[in-house]
Amino acid sequence: MLITERKHFRSGRIAQSMSEANLIDMEAGKLSKSCNITECQDPDLLHNWPDAFTLRGNNASKVANPFWNQLSASNPFLDDITQLRNNRKRNNISILKEDPFLFCREIENGNSFDSSGDELDVHQLLRQTSSRNSGRSKSVSELLDILDDTAHAHQSIHNSDQILLHDLEWLKNDREAYKMAWLSQRQLARSCLDLNTISQSPGWAQTQLAEVTIACKVNHQGGSVQLPESDITVHVPQGHVAVGEFQEVSLRAFLDPPHMLNHDLSCTVSPLLEIMLGNLNTMEALLLEMKIGAEVRKDPFSQVMTEMVCLHSLGKEGPFKVLSNCYIYKDTIQVKLIDLSQVMYLVVAAQAKALPSPAATIWDYIHKTTSIGIYGPKYIHPSFTVVLTVCGHNYMPGQLTISDIKKGGKNISPVVFQLWGKQSFLLDKPQDLSISIFSCDPDFEVKTEGERKEIKQKQLEAGEVVHQQFLFSLVEHREMHLFDFCVQVEPPNGEPVAQFSITTPDPTPNLKRLSNLPGYLQKKEEIKSAPLSPKILVKYPTFQDKTLNFSNYGVTLKAVLRQSKIDYFLEYFKGDTIALLGEGKVKAIGQSKVKEWYVGVLRGKIGLVHCKNVKVISKEQVMFMSDSVFTTRNLLEQIVLPLKKLTYIYSVVLTLVSEKVYDWKVLADVLGYSHLSLEDFDQIQADKESEKVSYVIKKLKEDCHTERNTRKFLYELIVALLKMDCQELVARLIQEAAVLTSAVKLGKGWRELAEKLVRLTKQQMEAYEIPHRGNTGDVAVEMMWKPAYDFLYTWSAHYGNNYRDVLQDLQSALDRMKNPVTKHWRELTGVLILVNSLEVLRVTAFSTSEEV
């Protein structure tokens, strides 16, 4: 017997999540009939908040950044940082004279985004003048779909029996809250998305949702909150909270149930539901209503031996206890939640009291529903993957993150798929199943090795969520179009338990359009899409492994051997001769005090030596050197070591390098991708030099993520850029990473640092924290890096291009704190060694000193 599930529309709004990992659903859906809540779907949000996407700065940068479309979709909340980056030349302006509300003020302008260092007109984004580029830019396809839909308007709902939409009143006047909602969707500090896969498969948006969450604010009149794409609803009765107070309800469902609840006597029949409440000062209980994936069989014995229970826990992994206030009718359960807490986990299970023969498992007493969800990309491509998800309940989210996608025999980073359709069927007992897929269209085929997949009996008994992948491909070079394929589920040597067909979505718009054009028109289209700006020709020098010639040396006046080793500091005996990289000095904290240090080389190691512990001599005065040879390769390998431990913003790195590197082939060769050729770019439709550079960077990112235990993306990229003599670009990247990492290390200590750097007042400090405050009115400890980063970026912007001064002043300020983080975190000291060694590296390693 087949049971076809009805499709639900997704509902939601932008909301501040309770942790960085919480992801918010942002599409429109069902409304509440009980509260005066204003509906605000995403199109309205964009059109009615022009100040949230304000154009500032020089419009010429639109041309400068060909990756704007991707960045504005992934990081629209970085607009204020952009302002600072564009205005860095204002070196003489005191930070104390500026508006402390820099990161939360409203700006009166409109109709554009501002993110990651460049500006873009939204209308220009919608026009998509380049057919090729539009094919690559489907990382913003979800945003384009939203902007295209302008017909929706604000409306107020006063009835009491509709589903509650989010209260957006608090967002309307809080620009930072909107930005923070985006931030909770995108993990800012360490982006590990497979951007190479995204660029090849338009429609797998870079800012996709990893899991569905809904958060609503309900007043004393009550209402209902429904999890999108589900039959899971929490009803808030009238009088639940006092007049003037609000209850914030957040719902999230996990497909994988707790494993300890699945065994012979028990099986879960619903997803694990997380309910988070913002107000525990309540007067009425909540009512949970949800559909479950099983019914007790009608025979008297099953009715006596089996019970459907709702289990409750304060932790995701248990322990769980049975709730008594439950009512079940057919496949629906209602649970009265009396003992409320801020975080609750609930799951429904069928439990048997005993298993007398011939019963073997709980399955013998119930009609168990098994569901299959078919997931794929938003648009189909000449080659794409379909994922079949099998679970023991009827909840299938509209989007699903798959983390074990394979490419070239290797696992790549997680990819988000869209729900194409779902089907449910009854299974009498757990048993081995085989799933087969057949294309109903001769233009498409399923890879032979992937036509049939197996699901084991033990996986069904354990309640596991099973993902099976099927690879489709276009036959030869036929026309792209949507098509049907058939899915069949059958046990060994038995009749199929389920058989149904699925229709794919449309092809990627640019592929569909170009595939329908005659050959000569396609050629014209390619010419029309060619870049207008001339290619910048730069001849990069070749890195040479030469022996360093030191002009200055130092003879140590005493021995320094530390019991507790300190990274980046030299140890030496009295009378040792240390080669000095120059006469410049670095200020940094040592064992306990801030001192001045030379950067030197001793016994093949580069590090700091206290200025007062050495007597500087000339090269002619050197009598004995323990280091006979120290080459530029040795220098490069050591000075970049701190970069392995620095945090970075991937989108910023991608933008800067793509703009400042003008020869993709040189970059590819230095990174070890000399096998890449122009034919590789034909597959991804990369015409501009910057797009090819971006492709190389994304490939490096993907490879480093695959081998993340042994390879570090920022480290390898900086090494390559230094070998190309791109020192200005390297300095910019290093400063960006050092500032962000310092903010993360500081956390709540940023206030003390701000006072030491620029003597901020208490009111000015609070201005930085206001945008990041949670429901309690305070900034969570794990979120303290955000106001710290806002402040440090504002402060560093006033230095312009004086990156050495930024890093040195930051080091000195951190050292002066009561409990300096730099006593344990020495990477900033290592970065100071790096920037003070760049000139020596350039003079020796390159035959020319031209700046790039």
Swiss-Prot record:
Any one of the GO CC terms: cytoplasm
Top-level taxon in the UniProt lineage: Eukaryota
Tissue expression per record: Preferentially expressed in metastasizing tumors.
UniProt keyword terms in alphabetical order: Activator, Cytoplasm, Growth factor, Mitogen, Nucleus, Phosphoprotein, SH3 domain, Transcription, Transcription regulation
UniProt GO MF annotations: growth factor activity
Localization per Swiss-Prot or TrEMBL: Cytoplasm; Nucleus
Annotated source species: Homo sapiens
Subunit structure: Interacts with FASLG.
Protein name (record): Metastasis-associated in colon cancer protein 1
Signal peptide: none
Function: Acts as a transcription activator for MET and as a key regulator of HGF-MET signaling. Promotes cell motility, proliferation and hepatocyte growth factor (HGF)-dependent scattering in vitro and tumor growth and metastasis in vivo.
Chain ranges of the SH3 domain: 549-619
KW Transcription (keyword) present: yes
InterPro entries: DEATH_SH3BP4, SH3_domain, SH3BP4_C, UPA_SH3BP4, ZU5_dom
Modified residues (Phosphoserine): S19
Pfam families in the record: DEATH_SH3BP4 (PF24094), SH3BP4_C (PF23637), UPA_SH3BP4 (PF23640)
GO terms for biological process, alphabetical: positive regulation of cell division; positive regulation of transcription by RNA polymerase II
Primary location group: cytoplasm
Domain ZU5 residues, every copy: 212-349
